[in-house]
Amino acid sequence: DNAGLNKKQNTDIAPQPMVLIGLGTIAANNAANPNTFATDLNFLVWGDNNGDMSDTDGELTINFNGGSGMTTVVDTPTRTWKIIENGGDIGSTRIAIPTSSLSGLPTPTSNDAYVMVIADDEGFSTNVETVFLTTSGANQIADYDFDGVKFFTFGVAKLNTGSLQITLDG
């Protein structure tokens, strides 16, 4: 941008690299990221609460919208991140976390999955979304478009089954 801050991807570094966020993609380094900001002075700022990455022994219950009555339970760490989008819409970002950073959580079984949980509040009770992570090398990755102020964390979503009723017309 015109301020000379053209940081298209960044990671935290203490005590070890944890979350890496890139504009559109994650490249070998900032200069190699081919994406550009649509508007000058657009940026994301994020930080974490320095919480532990081990399982909290508390579970986050997520209700799915649409009146299905379905829920899932997610084991989460105490570490959460706050991210602020400033200056307008940044667009889609790619988020990566080393799989080894999730080792304090329960190991996913064949029906479980690593997820990123996003919400409007630090208690993860308002406008809660989950995004499934996929494995890419030594990382778990997801694409997400952060808008405004959001909180996010990572976890292991447990398979939850239930019956659904379908009414066919005709």
Where are the regions that the model predicts?
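Catalytic cores of secreted or luminal carbohydrate-active enzymes
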Residues: 1-71
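A general structural signal for short secondary-structure junctions and capping/turn motifs
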Residues: 34-36, 105-108, 143-145
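Generic structural hydrophobic/aromatic packing signal, biased to beta-strands
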Residues: 44, 95-97, 116, 152-154
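Proteolytic processing hotspots in large secreted/extracellular or virion-associated proteins
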Residues: 64-114, 120
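Acidic glycine-/aspartate-rich tracts in secreted/extracellular proteins
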Residues: 120-125, 158
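Solvent-exposed serine/threonine-rich low-complexity stretches and specific carbohydrate-binding patches
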Residues: 127-138
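C-terminal beta-strand-rich structural cap/linker in extracellular carbohydrate-active enzymes
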Residues: 138-162
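Short, solvent-exposed loop/edge segments of extracellular or virion-exposed proteins
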Residues: 165-170
